[in-house]
């Protein structure tokens, strides 16, 4: 299969604002694109999604996604095949409007359609009310909410999407290309990251091409992703609410939403959860992810000199000759290049000075170090506050070994 890349210009995509100021900006999505290559590319992608079982790669504000119609099992299976994704790893569904989400949920409740449509606030009748503060504050954006599958005999999405569970996650992406594609195709898209399974998530179209060339028909190139890590996934169906996967919206931001969300906790995986009989509720809860070919060593609460000493000891214990290794280093706030031995072939990359910069650069830099042929990547850990929770979640899953130093 030939994989084509079509460039889209986000400046040409616009959305009509609602006439009612009290209405959510994306209660209904009306997209406007003048005749252009961008419009042709989006119409081509929408045609593939509607009329074939092949997935299409497209940019979101978090990472590039690989999408197919969440309602059609054969289309969803094509995502798993292209990525070589484990069958028990569920997918997140992407919608372009609250109206589209409402229609998707109502499709599973045919007896309730006429009754719900007569309600003045039908979105509140079908979407669990606990999520309304988050939807108002964070949608569109990098937040996924867990919804119930009420009738397993008539689910709103393919059972492949849910991995056979009684819940599924859904979000409304912020990226104009993602919103336009979902709106034009009028298809709720099941879309994990558009990379080969276990590889670092793609934040550029070329990352997608490197992993999935020959396996998918089309990549929409909308430039670099702005957030750089996947969405936060929350479960508000339990008390207290739980963050199942840290991501683009921080714990602190969610807790500031008030109500039940003030008590939000973070899911912590047990070692037993990683066994084969554990079925994750959302992506990112079970399998190793985000890993480059090089071996990643994560150092928590270590200075650069102490980290290098631990690394030398690690190589000695593994029987690895240090002089034959090419070493990459990812620094953030404390480490600096001058503190490492000058006689060793290090490749230094600075992830950034704050959480926003680090999340945006992390996956791209892991891929960059792979391209430079390093054997090991030494990574400076960060504090698990704000964006740091998602950063350390991703680094922990990418790392072969995590070294914990004394807390300061």
From Swiss-Prot:
Keyword vocabulary terms for this entry: ATP-binding, Chromosome, Cytoplasm, DNA-binding, Nucleotide-binding, Nucleotidyltransferase, Nucleus, Telomere, Transferase, Translation regulation, tRNA processing
Reaction(s) catalysed by this chain's protein: L-threonine + hydrogencarbonate + ATP = L-threonylcarbamoyladenylate + diphosphate + H2O
Membership in a protein family: Belongs to the SUA5 family.
Pfam families assigned: Sua5_C, Sua5_yciO_yrdC
Record-given protein name: Threonylcarbamoyl-AMP synthase
GO molecular function: ATP binding; DNA binding; double-stranded RNA binding; L-threonylcarbamoyladenylate synthase; nucleotidyltransferase activity; tRNA binding
Acetylation is among the record's keywords: no
Subcellular location: Cytoplasm; Nucleus; Chromosome, Telomere
Positions of the YrdC-like domain: 39-249
Taxonomic source organism: Schizosaccharomyces pombe (strain 972 / ATCC 24843)
Physiological role: Required for the formation of a threonylcarbamoyl group on adenosine at position 37 (t(6)A37) in tRNAs that read codons beginning with adenine. Likely catalyzes the conversion of L-threonine, HCO(3)(-)/CO(2) and ATP to give threonylcarbamoyl-AMP (TC-AMP) as the acyladenylate intermediate, with the release of diphosphate. Required for normal translation, by ensuring translation fidelity at the level of codon recognition, appropriate translation initiation selection and maintenance of reading frame. Also involved in telomere replication.
Gene designation per UniProt: sua5
């Amino acid at each position: 299969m030939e994989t084509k890349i079509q460039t889209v210009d986000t400046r040409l995509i616009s959305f009509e604002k609602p006439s009612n100021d009290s209405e959510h900006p994306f209660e209904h999505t009306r997209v406007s694109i003048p005749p252009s290559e961008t419009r042709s590319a989006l119409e081509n992608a929408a045609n593939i999604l509607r009329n074939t079982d092949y997935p299409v790669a497209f940019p979101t504000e978090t990472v590039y996604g690989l999408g197919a119609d969440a309602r059609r099992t054969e289309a969803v299976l094509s995502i798993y095949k292209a990525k070589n994704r484990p069958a028990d790893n569920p997918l997140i569904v992407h919608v372009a409007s609250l109206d589209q989400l409402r229609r998707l949920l109502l499709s599973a409740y045919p007896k309730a359609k006429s009754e719900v449509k007569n309600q003045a606030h039908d979105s509140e009748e079908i979407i669990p009310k606990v999520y309304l503060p988050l939807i108002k504050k964070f949608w569109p954006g990098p937040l996924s909410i867990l919804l119930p599958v009420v009738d397993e005999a008539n689910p709103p999405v393919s059972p492949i999407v849910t991995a056979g569970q009684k819940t599924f996650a859904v979000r409304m992406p912020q990226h104009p290309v993602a919103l336009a594609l979902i709106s034009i195709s009028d298809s709720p898209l099941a879309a994990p990251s558009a990379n080969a399974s276990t590889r670092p998530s793609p934040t550029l179209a070329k990352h997608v091409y490197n992993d999935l060339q020959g396996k998918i028909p089309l990549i929409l190139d909308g430039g670099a992703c702005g957030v750089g890590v996947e969405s936060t996934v929350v479960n508000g169906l339990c008390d207290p609410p739980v963050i199942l996967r840290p991501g683009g919206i921080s714990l602190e931001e969610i807790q500031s939403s008030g109500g039940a969300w003030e008590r939000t906790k973070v899911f912590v995986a047990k070692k037993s959860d990683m066994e084969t009989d554990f079925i994750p509720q959302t992506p990112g809860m079970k399998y190793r992810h985000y890993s480059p070919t090089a071996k990643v060593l994560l150092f928590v609460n270590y200075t650069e000199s102490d980290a290098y000493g631990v690394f030398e000891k690690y190589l000695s214990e593994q029987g690895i000759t240090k002089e034959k290794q090419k070493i990459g280093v990812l620094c953030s706030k404390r480490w600096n290049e001058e503190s490492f031995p000058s006689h060793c072939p290090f490749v230094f990359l600075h992830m950034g000075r704050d959480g926003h910069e680090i999340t945006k650069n992390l996956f791209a830099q892991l891929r960059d170090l792979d391209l430079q042929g390093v054997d090991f990547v030494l990574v400076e850990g960060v504090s698990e506050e704000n964006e740091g929770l998602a950063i350390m979640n991703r680094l922990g899953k990418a790392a072969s070994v995590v070294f914990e130093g004394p807390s300061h």
